[in-house]
Amino acid sequence: MKKENMAMLCDFYEFTMSNGYFKNGFYKKNVYFDVFFRKVPDNGGFAIMAGLEQAIEYIRELHFEDEDIEYLKSKGIFDEQFLEYLRNFKFSGDVYAIPEGTPIFPNEPVMTIKAPAIEAQLVETFLLLTINHQTLIATKANRIVRAAQGRAVLEFGSRRAQGANAAVDGARAAYIGGCKGTACTLTDELYGVPAGGTMAHSWVQMFNSEYDAFKTYCEMYPDNPTLLVDTYNTLKSGVPNAINAVSYTH
């Protein structure tokens, strides 16, 4: 998966404030910015920290391309010396964070950025969107896993995710929250989250009978057949046909 430069994925006021810091001599001043949240959704007791790996990768790779500088220059409001500063930008600060998968609580810092003012300001948007999204997914997944009381829970969220990155990162976050695996193949390829799944209704409908569909699938994947039993009638045909197909092939 090709990595994109996310430097410009940033609220515009981060640039206008940073320009002001530069012109007023604040850009070398070290500051501390904390990432925290105020309330756990749905009256939950705690959240599950997630998104740290992507946040750190972003900080390490953060730089501005020539076209980014030209875009900012075209706005006509940024100091030339500030734009030159951005051209040579590299994060030099320190990051302190709670490890992924750790329970976290309202109003406590889950990440602290110690850096020169401009550096701390420019990373704000990406850090918040990354930690907020993945922590939300990990927290919800953890609640479901705990409610399942030891039964395996899988993540199948890609087709309803808000974009490709949300699908991949959301599956990773669900795994951090306790899910056993995901339907998202790319998340397995990139992060090693076990990919798996059942079958689609289209597979069952491709055959002359539900039993034939199950039997063929069991023959192809005898070690771990997972059958979808609700295409026609779950109790009258799906479950009986699944039992018969598994019994026949085993």
Language model region names:
Residues M1-Y32, K39-P41, I77, L83-S92, ...:
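Buried, small/hydrophobic-residue-enriched core segments of structured protein domains
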Residues Y32-R87:
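N-terminal, Lys/Arg-enriched amphipathic/low-complexity engagement segments
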